[in-house]
Structures are given as C-alpha cells and as structure tokens.
Amino acid sequence: MILIAALIKLTSRGSVFYTQTRIGIDRRKFGEPPGNSRRRHDCGGKPFTIYKFRTMAPHRGPHGAGEVWALSNDPRVTPVGRVLRKYRLDELPQLINVLRGEMNVVGPRPEQPTIFARLRQEIERYEERQRVRPGITGWAQINQSYDSCVDDVRRKLAYDLEYIHRQSALEDLRIMLRTLPVVIGKKGAW
C-alpha cells in the first residue's frame, strides 16, 4: 500500500486517498417503518466514510462533484488510477473500514446517500441490501462489472439479494476465492 501511495503522490497532485460518504447497514428490524423519531432524515442505513486510493485527477472536467456513472475511458482517471482500477487495488484502503466495523470483506457494495435515495425509489426491494454490512467484494461484483445504468443496478440487486439469502462463512470464503481471478484477470473497471 505504501508503494501505491507513493505512485499516486509522484504522478498527480492532490491527496493519496479519496473519501466519500456511503450508506452502511440498516440495523432496524426488517419491515419496521422507515421513520425514526431521533433522525431528521431516513437515509436507509448508517452513513460512514469510505476510503479508497484516489484514481482521478482532483476536480477535473465538468463532473467536479456529485454522483456520476463510471465512464469508459473517463478523462478524469489518471494513468496510475487506470491500473489501480483495472486490478481493483483502489479498494485496498477499505480494509480500514472493515477494521472499524463499517464494512465486511464480502457484502453488497455501499452506495452514496443521494444515489441510494434515488435507487430505492426507482428499484423495488433495493433497500433490502442494507440488511447486511456492505463489503469490498460481493456476489454481484464477481458476476458483473461496474454499473453504467439503472438496469445494471437491477441485475446487481438480484445477485445481492441472492447473497443475503445464502450468507454464511463458507459462502463468503467462496466469494473471496472467486474474487481473485476477477482481480488477477483484470476484470475490474474499463
């Protein structure tokens, strides 16, 4: 991880890490009403800060902020970032999130609050993925690449719900082992 951090720092300006708010596990009992008298806003789970290695030039181009679908040949991605994404090495700092108890190694990928709010309105059962702690890798990630539209998210949701139904230590081990060929075979981002 030190080598990756040095490469990022030597080849582009800005921080080595990229942080962003994501939505974590929703500890309410399933079927409980979404409101909570102590919360002003129901965000569908506990927000947390996710850590990644920075793969894009900071605030470059028209997409300086906000949520955007990942783009093939995105001009914002740095040369080092392209390699990190290809091998999914940009996800390594999420081990910090695992140690903090915010994520597991295996589980549905955590989403940004604004995207989560929109998707749970558009896609039936989307909020059910919050019944488990989010993960660095998951059943959806080894079966499908990055999302580029809502239909991709629907397909990934089917995998996430299947994982939740079958979740066990043995299933997690199987997914971790199946993640290795995805990483080694460069089946990550474009």
What feature does the model see in each segment?
Residues H59-A65, R109-I115, V150:
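Cytochrome P450 core scaffold surrounding the K-helix E-X-X-R motif
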Residues Y18, T78-R82, Y159:
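Positions in alpha-helical segments
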Residues I4-A5, I50, G64-E67, W139-Q141:
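Adenylate-forming
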Residues I2, M56, A70-R133, I175-V183:
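A short, structured surface patch at a secondary-structure boundary
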Residues R60, E67-R76, D151-R155:
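The feature captures the short pre-catalytic strand/loop hairpin that immediately precedes
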Residues K52, R76-P79, Q141, D172:
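Residue-level recognition of specific faces of alpha-helices
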Residues I123-W190:
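C-terminal terminal-structure detector
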Residues M1-H59, A169-W190:
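A hydrophobic, helix-centered structural microdomain
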